[in-house]
Amino acid sequence: MSVTLSDLQTRLAYRLGEDSAPSDSNEVNRRKSFFNEAQRKALGEYYWWFLEDQKSTTSVDAQEIYSLDSTFREMIELRVDGDVVTPIAKHDAFATFDYPPLSYQYESVTPNYYIFGDNELHLLPIPSSAPSAVAVTSITQTAGVATVTTTTAHGYFNHGWVTIAGATPTAYNGEQHITSVADTTHFTFSVASATTSPATGTITATERNIVYRFWKLVVDLSDTTDTISLPDRYADALIAYAFGRKVGTVEGMEGTANNAFAEFNEIIKDMSAEQNRKQIYNKSVKPEWS
């Protein structure tokens, strides 16, 4: 999903027979509203395969509440320290346990969570520990792969998440997804290939032990560099819809507008077929033995 709002403006201009995207701000905003309207109509309230995302955070001793990503819509799976955490209804949490709950009440049951409001995560029981920072000896970068060396065993695993802090350049810092673990003192993550190597500073790595997969919200396009929320191969759906909205107000062009909306519907039909293939057919099937 790399097609930008700027790309859409240019491609729509070409379809309209124009040499370039408009410079008039009113017309630019008008066409942007068409693209956003098209994206909302195309995606609707469905859980499309490409709207699945994964984020992480770090538990804090004695802290129950954590903020989820701003695009959070609905939870798919939550893991704490690698273990699956079971959802519980908010009213059940209040009705079943002392609130806030005590750890000993959960010794024989699965830890739970519930969501309050739009993106407020509550963990039950309240975490009683937090990951410790691990000192980093060095970070080097080759071809976009950052290799981290720690002074002691880090305890991390492939596809885990960490927070890097204290590094210069700052591109190494922040939430990082571990792409490989060579041994107990080395792991890698992706970084821009132009990032200066090696990193300097007093560097630490801290495990992000709360990992959640979720369905994300569709965000309207605003800046020219914003990318569309659907796969690039279906971008023509947005262009066709915007074209129909643009020419639909021109006398004598109603038929052309209808053709554009029909094109939009056909592309969305293709996207729906791909959704069905991924959800139904692209799954492992247990063989039948005679």
Residue ranges and their predicted role:
Residues 130-216:
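Small/polar beta-strand repeat architecture
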